[in-house]
């Protein structure tokens, strides 16, 4: 784990409470960001592309099949973090959007579309994402972009690797023979992007417990790589920074004989602290990755916030 154990919510039967009430968010006034717009300074594209080349070299040597490489954009932030969350939520609605803050004034603003784990009693599913295309305003061009993404052999192969990893991770805690790929990959459209997503389902024994479930599956396959341990080592060597909350997970857990919980993958997640906003973005790197194209994909993923 990348965190210290700490109580985030107080849970009693079906009631829950936190320091941030949903009613508070709903009542926030719509923020006008134009006067406070700050340019996010990205790392130089050349440095990121050099990292892509290093990963391709490791792939050529047989050490890796795939790895997720990220970089971080940052800028000064003036305003109210909750208001920014509400403003972005209206333009980027996703089921797993969330706002979190601690007593020290640090905030997470997440508009992640990716489900890491969804648990309902003995049923578990995971919905990894790999493959991205920009949405077009013209309906015909937009449909063409989605079709091209769906037929892109590189993106298909990349998602297939992540599906296999996720299936293997869930197999560590699932009942024998109870892991299945429900959807090997379909294009799902969001307000600004198309993504390719898969669905893997498993049955498990709930008495196994949350700690063992997380230990078997974390970090998510889609933001690490294959094989996972070597990919994480390579990522740390190349990125030379802590990812913090980015690519971690945020969710809730209702313990019982038939537990329920849901955890997102913290992508599309901005971190705000001490007047600075940080947004990390990444792309999956495989042998046939083009460094320039991967760099441009990361910028595309951060566009929803940079254009705000």
Regions found by a protein language model. Give the residues of each.
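Short, exposed "boundary/linker" segments that immediately precede the start
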Residues: 3-11, 15
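Extended alpha-helical targeting/anchoring segments
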Residues: 12, 18, 23-308
């Amino acid at each position: 784990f990348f965190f210290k154990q700490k109580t985030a919510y107080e849970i009693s039967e079906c009631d829950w409470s936190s320091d941030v009430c949903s009613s508070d968010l709903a009542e926030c006034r719509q923020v006008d960001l134009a006067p406070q717009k700050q340019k996010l300074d990205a790392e130089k594209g050349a440095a990121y592309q050099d990292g892509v080349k290093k990963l391709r070299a490791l792939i050529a040597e047989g050490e890796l099949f795939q790895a997720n490489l990220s970089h971080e954009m940052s800028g000064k932030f003036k305003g109210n973090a909750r208001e920014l969350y509400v403003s972005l939520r209206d333009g980027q609605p996703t089921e797993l959007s969330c706002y979190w803050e601690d007593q020290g004034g640090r905030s997470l603003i997440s508009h992640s579309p990716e489900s890491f784990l969804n648990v309902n009693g003995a049923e578990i599913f995971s919905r990894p994402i790999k493959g991205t295309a920009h949405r077009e305003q013209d309906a015909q061009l937009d449909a063409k972009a989605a079709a091209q993404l769906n037929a892109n052999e590189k993106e298909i192969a990349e998602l297939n690797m992540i599906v296999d990893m996720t299936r293997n991770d869930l197999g560590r805690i699932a009942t024998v023979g109870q892991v299945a790929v429900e959807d090997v990959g379909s294009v799902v459209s969001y307000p600004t992007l198309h993504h390719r997503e898969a669905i893997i389902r498993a049955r498990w024994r709930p008495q196994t417990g949350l700690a063992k479930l997380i230990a078997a599956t974390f970090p998510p396959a889609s933001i690490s790589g294959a094989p996972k341990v070597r990919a994480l080592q390579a990522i740390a060597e190349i990125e030379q920074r802590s990812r913090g909350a980015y690519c971690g997970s945020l969710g809730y857990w209702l313990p019982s004989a038939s537990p329920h919980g849901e955890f997102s993958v913290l992508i599309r997640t901005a971190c705000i602290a001490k007047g600075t906003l940080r947004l990390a973005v990444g792309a999956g790197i495989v042998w046939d990755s083009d460094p320039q194209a991967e760099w441009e994909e990361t910028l595309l993923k951060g566009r929803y916030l940079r254009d705000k």
